[in-house]
Amino acid sequence: MDFKNKKWLFLAPLAGYTDLPFRSVVKKFGVDVTTSEMVSSHSLVYAFDKTSKMLEKSPLEDHFMAQISGSKESVVKEAVEKINALDHVSGIDFNCGCPAPKVANHGNGSGLLKDLNHLVEILKVIRENTNKKITSVKVRLGFEKKIPKEIAHALNDAPVDYVVVHGRTRSDRYQKDKIDYESIALMKKILKKPVIANGEIDSVKKAFEVLQITQADGLMIGRATLRAPWIFWQIRNNTTELPAVVKKDLVLEHFDKMVEFYGDRGVIMFRKNLHAYAKGEMQASAFRNCVNTLTEIKSMRESIEEFFNQEMLQSEVPLWVELNQKSV
């Protein structure tokens, strides 16, 4: 990955959202790097046949990172060895940012920010045992309080190719007013490796503001893509215009990919995606109530076609959606 000639654009891992069907849709809008949903090392080691489905990728994904979490070096080592057998995976991203209590309170995710020496040792284990070309880490600014300097200095000793920084602490969760790009800028000055800025990037204007403040080598965007997967195309072309795509066709394509990947179960799983796509449109509440009752492919597809009729759309402005607390 050459960070000298362009600013790289990354799709953030979002639990329950950034599966293969969604990533394949977003990839068409120019995102450079896609990342799997977070997978625990324990699940990879002890339930690989089931968990490995989360690490499948579409033919469109040329830079595909598998994101793993964990705190036990021996288990992380075994998980890395499992991923070694997956030739389509470009690299491993280690999660040190997940704020969910069931993750962080057990020393995983953002919980590792309380023991930076241990974090660095795990990153060394990953590098020493992976056969992939790329190793990266995603962090927050700290656990209870901000410690950007300490994290940056520690990661200078870690064998990673780039660092993704989410501009909040674990205790900040996803509070919009807590985002701190200045601390990302501070880490960028200290780190001797590329830095990717993440958090609250929901428009082209915001993207360029964050790049200016942080001087980051790229951007990682998550929640905004659920409503507007074309945001990467807009950033790459520095425009607020929309790409030549009919929203109904995009939603239907995503739905069809869900059914193809998950079977009939994909109908129910797609409800949350429809909630995001419909936000800001007239009759969105009624539509959500409707799709929450549908379980059959035919009836769901008909409802999508009716609601997302081009003439009904009132807004194509990227909007935020609320996610579950597992999302990073």
From Swiss-Prot:
SUPFAM superfamilies: FMN-linked oxidoreductases. Its EC number is 1.3.1.-. It is an enzyme of class 1 (oxidoreductase). The active site is at C98 (proton donor). The keyword Oxidoreductase applies. It catalyses: a 5,6-dihydrouridine in tRNA + NAD(+) = a uridine in tRNA + NADH + H(+); a 5,6-dihydrouridine in tRNA + NADP(+) = a uridine in tRNA + NADPH + H(+). It comes from the Bacteria. GO terms for molecular function: flavin adenine dinucleotide binding; tRNA binding; tRNA dihydrouridine synthase activity. FMN binds at P13, L14, A15, Q67, K138, N198, G199, E200, G222, R223. Its cofactor is FMN. Keywords: Flavoprotein, FMN, NADP, Oxidoreductase, RNA-binding, tRNA processing, tRNA-binding. Belongs to the Dus family. Catalyzes the synthesis of 5,6-dihydrouridine (D), a modified base found in the D-loop of most tRNAs, via the reduction of the C5-C6 double bond in target uridines. This is Probable tRNA-dihydrouridine synthase.
